[in-house]
Regions:
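Conserved ABC ATPase "signature" region
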Residues: 1, 93, 97, 104-122
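Helix-to-loop junction immediately C-terminal to a conserved catalytic motif
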Residues: 44
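Conserved ABC transporter NBD signature motif
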Residues: 52-60, 68
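Conserved catalytic motifs of ABC-family nucleotide-binding domains
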Residues: 147
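Catalytic Walker B motif of ABC-type/P-loop ATPase nucleotide-binding domains
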Residues: 151-155
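ABC transporter nucleotide-binding domain
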Residues: 169-263
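C-terminal coupling/interaction segments
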Residues: 263-309
Length: 309
């Protein structure tokens, strides 16, 4: 797929293909410029590729966009799509009419959607008076009110505080599972992505780096990480020196008398511990730690950037 701006054609996405099944959430991850927003906008019909092919549920994203929109729920990042001076209920009524809902069917859809997202008590409240978390829930209600088969959620928790974001994410998971929906979600809050234990797609400069389970990503790419805590500064200093001299071992960070190291895949831990033999009397604790997703992705994308063109 190629999206052409005014001055110069840019290949925004290249051979990006993956499947998301019913009841499954797929997290689309990548740095700025990776192609996440372009991908979402093409799938929902807001951007037309100048070449290439995109499909949702077997429908062509360009020639059959109407059929896709009937079956797809879209939650954009910001509140600009909400009519701020209208009530929550009237916002949904307006959107429902655009989806072809009328009369009793429309009113039932409005009330059901408000109930699902916990906003029924503020149905008559103007949107401009709502908190950012409630606005995010209203956007979610709008995305699900016509009972779609697919949900596309672009940074749904971006403007929401951590407590509200946690509740919103749990709500999304419940909606996807109970409705047996296929969902795409993007987020810069990588702790949220990790909490989903979901299917993950990694994009970089419009290309697909990885498509699979997060656990598979860790098995394929993750290196063993160790934390060592010492009872004296001298033991800490000696160990840091020895570790820095070992091939295949990288000192990630040091805090007080603790050292965090990454061991290259395929490197045995035996020689590492043997090198520390003279400092073992000062070693208080040795533990293997799970690497935060943000560190794992930073390593992946850092490797990509270092690769020759």
């Amino acid at each position: 797929m190629i999206k052409s701006p005014i001055r110069k054609p840019v290949q925004a996405l290249q051979a990006v293909s993956f499947e998301v099944g019913p009841g499954e959430i797929c997290a689309v991850v990548g740095p700025n410029g990776a192609g996440k927003t372009t991908l979402f906008r093409i799938l929902v019909g807001l951007t037309t590729p100048t070449s290439g092919f995109a499909s949702v549920l077997g429908y062509d994203a360009v020639t059959q966009s109407v059929q896709i929109r009937r079956r797809l729920g879209w939650l954009p990042t910001d509140d600009a799509s909400l009519l701020q001076r209208l009530s929550c209920g009237d916002n949904l009524r307006f959107h429902g009419r655009l989806k072809g809902l009328l009369g009793r069917e429309l009113e039932t859809a409005v009330q059901d959607a408000l109930e699902v997202v916990g906003l029924r008590e503020v149905a008559r409240t103007a949107v401009l008076t709502l908190s950012s978390g409630m606005k995010a829930r209203l956007r979610l209600a709008r995305a699900i009110m016509h009972k779609p088969q697919v949900l596309i959620l672009d940074e749904p928790t971006a403007a929401v505080d951590p407590v509200g974001a946690h509740g919103l994410l749990n709500l999304i998971v419940d909606i996807v599972r109970q409705g047996d929906l296929a969902a795409l979600i993007s987020s810069h809050r990588l702790d949220e992505i990790e909490a989903l234990h979901s299917h993950v797609v990694l994009l970089n400069k419009g290309t697909l780096l990885f498509d699979g389970d997060l656990d598979d990503l860790r098995r394929d790419i993750d290196r063993p990480h160790l934390e060592l805590a010492f009872g004296s500064q001298q033991g800490f200093l000696d160990a840091r020196t020895h570790l820095a001299e070992l091939e295949g071992v990288e000192v990630i960070r040091t805090i007080d008398n603790e050292i965090h190291v990454a061991v290259r895949r395929g490197v045995s831990l035996g020689p590492v511990l043997l090198r520390l033999e003279n400092t073992l009397e000062d070693l208080l604790e040795l533990r293997q730690v799970k690497v935060p997703l943000r560190d794992l992705l930073a390593e992946i994308y850092g490797t990509v950037k270092r690769d020759p063109e």
